[in-house]
Amino acid sequence: MNRRLVGFLGIGAWVLFWAASVALAALRPSYSHVVNTVSELGAVGTPHATAWNVFGFIIPGVLLAIVGATIARTANPVPSLSRTLATVLLVLCGLAVAGQGVMPAVMANGVADVASISTRGHFVCSLISAAAWAVGALLLVGPMKRNPYWQNVYIVSAALVVLTLVVALALRGTLPDGLAQRIGNAFFCVWFILMSLKLVWLEPQLASSVRVGGPV
């Protein structure tokens, strides 16, 4: 698949995620972006839950899996164990996001029913998506530094991962759940958007390099 197209898909995944979040939350007057987590939009039995799970989790997750694989293989063009692991982890990240929509949480008054298999699966997918992304992205920092086409983003990439982890640990319990989650999601989102933009801008450069016989 054309890397430029994949880059646009990565941007589109997040546009869809945030647009669905805003639109579906607006249909629930009691929902607060500060207090409520995004999982509550798709909780079993809530209004428009299926719409959120499809447009907020499943479609964006599948797109992020495709984008993640392309980012890993483009940023690290040399076949290696590190490249394979980064590719697998970023694909797993996207699929785990989609998995949160396949297994929505069961909640009552904003409290998760941890006895529910679906709820447990939802939270496991959430943890997997975060951990797989963090490790996968960090595995690409070295290759990005060595790749002349990606050298200008390796520091930002590492910083966004660190910021996401710091926010996840530091803000838990100090801010309302919805706000803390969205701040963490913002760094996660920015990483994918920046890397997707890199794919969009990079494709013409790579095509030009191939035409003149330069390195890919």
What are these regions (language model features)?
Residues M1-Y31, N36-L206:
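Hydrophobic, aromatic-enriched alpha-helical segments typical of multi-pass transmembrane helices
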Residues Q205-V216:
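Short, intrinsically disordered terminal tails adjacent to the first/last structured region
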